[in-house]
């Protein structure tokens, strides 16, 4: 069983890729696209941010530049609708592109859905409402049901909708992490036929760089237990990509047992499994987060 992967590294915030985007320097971007494809990514995310000035030209150039070297579908990641449309127009390879994203904000949702329908794209339905971040599971559920209803009304089929409940940093509000996990388990009943996606790196935001992969990997396996379909991932994390391919059944089993409330004696486990056990306990809110959670 596999998790569909959307590789996250072609991002305007990157120290190497950002300048290459602005200077229309194809080489580093194409090299990264090839590396992410070779790592096994199913989609490549192309994140240009709000790109207020010249975003349409930039997105069109990026789609064509990337598609010169790989034939994967792209996740077009921008809050600029003009840039989004330019990317959708230019997207000719790899099947349906993914609009990342359509949020639930009253002033944005209709225009977003129109673009998805017009270009026959798939979409990330971001559960960010007019009041901002949903506070709990119930607010996420209400936003999801409303979003899917509106999308279906426009003629967008449920199988083209990837619901994103918004993962938040474990260093922030642990109840939000728990709500995201819980919501994932409810999604198939709330919105039958829809897919799901989560930005895994969000959960480790603000934690020490060398520890981030532990959180990202453990959270992937927790959400996988809850029926996760796809994830926005660091394709350069080999262990994470192996988990997405369905390798390491012993880790899947361990996480499943911990989430079901089973007793696990950590001292009897190999080091790698001890790390997963400790990390899952933090992400479930059973242990308090601190930068030394793996040593405790």
Specify the residue positions occupied by each region the protein language model found.
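Catalytic alpha/beta core domains of metabolic enzymes, predominantly
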Residues: 111, 118-266
């Amino acid at each position: 069983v596999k998790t569909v992967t959307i590789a996250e590294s072609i991002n305007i915030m990157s120290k190497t890729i950002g300048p290459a985007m602005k200077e229309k320097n194809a080489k580093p971007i194409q090299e990264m696209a090839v590396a992410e494809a070779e790592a096994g990514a199913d989609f490549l995310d192309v994140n240009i941010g709000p790109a207020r000035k010249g975003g349409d030209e930039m997105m069109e150039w990026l789609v064509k530049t990337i598609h010169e070297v790989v034939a994967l579908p792209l996740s077009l990641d921008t809050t600029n609708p003009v840039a989004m449309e330019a990317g959708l127009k230019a997207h000719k390879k790899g099947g349906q592109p993914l609009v990342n994203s359509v949020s639930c904000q009253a002033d944005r949702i209709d225009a977003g859905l129109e673009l998805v329908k017009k270009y026959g794209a798939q979409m990330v339905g971001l559960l960010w409402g007019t009041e901002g971040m949903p506070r709990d599971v119930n607010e996420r559920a209400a936003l999801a049901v409303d979003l899917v209803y509106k999308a279906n009304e426009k003629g967008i089929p449920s199988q083209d909708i990837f619901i994103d409940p918004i993962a938040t940093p474990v260093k922030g509000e642990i109840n939000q992490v728990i709500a995201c996990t819980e919501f994932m388990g409810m999604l198939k009943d709330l919105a039958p036929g829809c897919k799901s996606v989560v930005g895994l790196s969000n959960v480790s935001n603000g934690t020490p760089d060398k520890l981030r992969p532990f959180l990202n990997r453990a959270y992937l396996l927790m959400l996988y237990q809850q029926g996760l379909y796809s994830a926005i991932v660091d394709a350069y994390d080999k262990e994470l990509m192996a988990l997405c391919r369905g390798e390491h059944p012993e880790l899947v089993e361990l996480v499943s047992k911990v989430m079901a409330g089973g007793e696990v004696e950590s001292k009897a486990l190999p080091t790698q499994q001890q790390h997963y056990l400790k990390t899952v306990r933090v992400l479930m809110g059973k242990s308090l987060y601190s930068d030394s959670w793996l040593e405790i």
